[in-house]
Amino acid sequence: MAASPNPLQGSLFEESKQSTTNGGKETNNSIGSSENLSNQQLKSDASLRPRIRKTSKNPNQINDLDQLSNAEIEEPKWSHHNLPKIDDLTPALKHYVQLKIENPDRVLLYRLGDFFECFFEDAITLSQLLEITLTSKEGGKKIGKVPMAGIPHHASDRYCTELIKKGLSIAICDQLEAAPSKGNKLIKRGITRLITPGTIIEEGMLSAKQNNWLASVLLESDSNSDFVNWSLAKLDVSTGEFLVQEGKETNNLRQELIKLKAAEVISESKSISNQNWYKGLIEITEFNQTSFSRLEAKTTIENHYFLNNIDGLGIHPESLSIRTIGGLIAYLNKTHPNIGNNLKNEVKTNICIDFPQIKHNQAGLIIDNQTRRNLEITSTQKNGQFQGSLLWAIDKTLTAMGGRCIRRWLEEPLTEIYSIQSRQKIIGLLVESSSLRKNIRKILRAMGDLERLSGRAGAQQAGARDLIAIAEGINRLPLIKKYLNDPIFEETKYFESIINLDRDLIELASKINNEIIDNPPLSLTEGGLIFDGVNPILDGLRNQLDDHNSWLKSQEIEERKNSNINNLKLQYHRSFGYFLAVSKAKSINVPDHWIRRQTLTNEERFVTPELKEREGKIFQLRARISQLEYDLFCKLRILVGNKSDIIRKAAKAISCLDVLSGLAELAATNNYIQPKIIDNKDSTKTRRLSIVDGRHPVVEQILVDKFFVPNDIELGSKTDLIILSGPNASGKSCYLRQVGLLQIMAQIGSWIPAKSANIGIADQLFTRVGAVDDLASGQSTFMVEMIETAFILNNATENSLVLLDEIGRGTSTFDGLSIAWSVSEFLAKKIKSRSIFATHYHELNQISEYIENVENYKVVVEYKNHSLSFLHKVEKGGANKSYGIEAARLAGVPPDVVNNARLILKNLEKNNSNTIQITKPIESCK
């Protein structure tokens, strides 16, 4: 069918219908072809035949609504606020409008056959955002055609992902039966999902190795102090992980939310109405305030987990966290309205999520967000890429759930020595036994994402292929259990769910494999899901269908014989059903009782009354078979969903095993060693940080064809502060980051790149490496630097690790030196944290002369004949030159500039008598 012409489009090449006369006189049109006309001739022609400018609206500036036409002020014709009368619509569109009224702020995707369709304003929105064709559909006799746009149901995840990225929420109206029930003309449909950024469970819409967090946050004033109490609950709907924490300062909440990178954050309007701390940082969705009330939240929690009371959660019933948990679950229930419903609405279950776990603020190594960026733990600082980060360097996981697990470990390193040592022991066993490691990794390589697969099953959103993947994963568990027979694996709680494998899971996997065919279709409502021999009624229906198919084959032979048309074929078309096809030449010989159905260029198609009757019976059988197969599948999916919590426990064990075997592979192939973690009970050694020949875990892998120079570090026993000096580009910043990354690796239980190491557990890790303007908040580079420094000095303890680079360089020389000097003394004498201070201020080397826990180190360089060579070796002693001019030369600064800089430097050194010399400590820092 030809497309309708665009009414806004016209031909660019139409001949002008304008008269060629001017004032009754004929104009000269014979002056030559247009390409030969001069500019003067064209101007002359324009003056003789002036063109009148056509305008569609007043070009003047609009200052008042009265200047606008009614059409511009009113809602667009197809806006959902201006929908036509429901009674005038066709039945399908009538249902669509009813659902749209219930979901006015969401794009409504309505399943019709193989497509999800949108109508009215949503169709226009869909067409514009996804750049798909906007068409129309008959809306009723009084309505006429209405806008329509659609997406294929099998590709809906991809399109929904695009809509979510563009900030929209989606309501999914799907078919609730394979064929219309008896007495109904329309297939039953209903809202099955409300998709928002934080409630996604569909595989194609999620990042495999990253959590997708939905968070709820509440704040309230503390009547006993000036602080604001806050509670943050976070849930990954796809994996079931559920954590909650509380605090007292909004800055701490801000840090947690930056680290979390939640896909969606909800709150009640009362909590955020007068708050500014989150603006410009995150978008917060306001949710029903009553859902966050203590009474309703308590009821929501009890109903969801089938509890008589909430005391068993371990959360005080009067705490703010009860409200954040209840509000979050209420939001989840709203976005998954029909969780667990099968076609006949016989079963309803709750989506499977873990019991909320209390996360204590001091439970792990505290790393602020500036430090995370500086150390490039999960993404690079410059462009936010994965490649070049610590996670990129050490992630050798083979499964999606293992990838998420190692990311969580890096984001929250441990401070409890037993847990760290448990991980170390398992890695050690897997390093020593390469065959054990390789066998385990071979099993894991093809393991599906059991965490998210079981989550979809629990939400009754899993497809047939999802259940097959679950069964394949479960079938690998006994083999993994076989390899976990060493006592070291039994000492930790990680692998309890596999060592004590639930036999019900094995039986469930067997049931899945026995009932669902090996390669099932994506569609669940078109049959072809269930093996023969599973259900006697299904087998009987299939036998009946086979009989009809046999009749079709015999009928083709019989009609060919009776008509004497040898090339006759009995065929099927999805739109036309069954028909008899003959060539054009033979069509004159067809029997009289044949009825012409369709004419093609080289073929004629016919039907017979008997064939049409048989076709109706076949279609009815197919519909019954498809419906029964879907019902059987739903029952099986419910069984899997009921076991989703057990499957998830096994999945968490698999994810830990994947991480540990990956870290063992990393250690074995990169010559890593097991660091000795110093027990906190040994107060004389607990702060020690001693690493021999340590290497940067990321840079070492990037320097494929070059040798990485290893370096030592000794802090915490006698020395608390190292003053590190050396020229630009010599490796000071790399050394600082190396120390920080090795501390993190040690506290997640990993082995590290070094010759030997004794590492005390740090409670906090701070870095200040480089700074940039914060234009959004009007802060200069120097102010940003001072704010970061103040945060460190106000929060660090003697058990912290502090790494500072170039403090004080953003102001005048003497101001900067004074600040750097004072900060160094404060760290060494007041806080006594393990600290490294990299600087170009060589005067700071004097501090070690009167503060005994300060020591000078330098990055060694070779300088001969105005040529500078970086050796990247850190040694004891202070540097006395910065070699900044030589570094500029190496960077490609023009020779004239470099030579002139040398002359200027000589004059400055000759004339500068303001040498700084301090021989006694600053009294205020004693």
Swiss-Prot record:
Cellular component GO terms, alphabetical: cytosol
GO BP annotation list: mismatch repair
Feature: compositional bias, Polar residues: 18-44, 57-67
Disordered: region residues: 1-67
Keyword Lyase: no
Xref: InterPro entries: DNA_mismatch_repair_MutS, DNA_mismatch_repair_MutS-lik_N, DNA_mismatch_repair_MutS/MSH, DNA_mismatch_repair_MutS_C, DNA_mismatch_repair_MutS_clamp, DNA_mismatch_repair_MutS_core, DNA_mismatch_repair_MutS_N, DNA_mismatch_repair_MutS_sf
Positions contributing to ATP binding: 726-733
Family annotation (NCBIfam families): mutS1, PRK05399.1
Known function: This protein is involved in the repair of mismatches in DNA. It is possible that it carries out the mismatch recognition step. This protein has a weak ATPase activity.
Name the UniProt record assigns to this protein: DNA mismatch repair protein MutS
Organism field: Prochlorococcus marinus (strain NATL1A)
